Amino acid sequence: MIAVSGIPGSGKTSLAGIMAQRINKLHAQQSPDAPPAAIFVPMDGYHLTRAQLAAMPDPAFAAARRGAAFTFDPEKFLRLVTKLREPLLDTASTPTIYAPSFDHAVKDPVEDDIPIPATSRVIFFEGNYLSLDKEPWNTAARLMDELWFVEVDFETARRRLIKRHVEAGIAKDADEADKRARENDLVNGREIVENRMPVQEIIVSREDSAWGR
């Protein structure tokens, strides 16, 4: 169980996904009839729903800060990790465990949408706060076999976030996207960097169009 974290725009999602794909490609070459060995579980499904944000004391602030640590359900994530940490006695009789995904069209989580079969041997978790040294995030982190952190400078992250927010329709133009990046994403990034637990691997994110091919 490997938790890949980093500030928004660091490239952690790309890294975790590519690592799982490469492991599965190598595994398929060696054991063509075997099920995939690696799986990728993003933390997006642990966002609080829009209804939950609307029920907060300051719903406008909660909506504007969506993506901050307080807009996630870390206890729910901890329950998943705790369940996956239990000893695996019999692959054939162990039921599949499910994690939530996130539907960007409706902007809310989708329950039980990511199957994690008992045949999984490497699980990559990905999310901003997976090495955050605050309860209960750090409790979940201590259940991992390794913590990886994707490091990037804040200016590079800001440029990536502007592009991402415009392309995803989160912001109508670059100015609005820049405002969101500076007032939300990079504020969260400061908390992540300043409260990071010790990690086993630090991966420096660099621009390389050929990487991952």
Predicted regions, residues:
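Short hydrophobic/aromatic beta-strand immediately N-terminal to the Walker A/P-loop
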Residues: 1-3
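ATP-dependent NMP and nucleoside kinases share a basic, alpha-helical "lid"
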Residues: 106-164
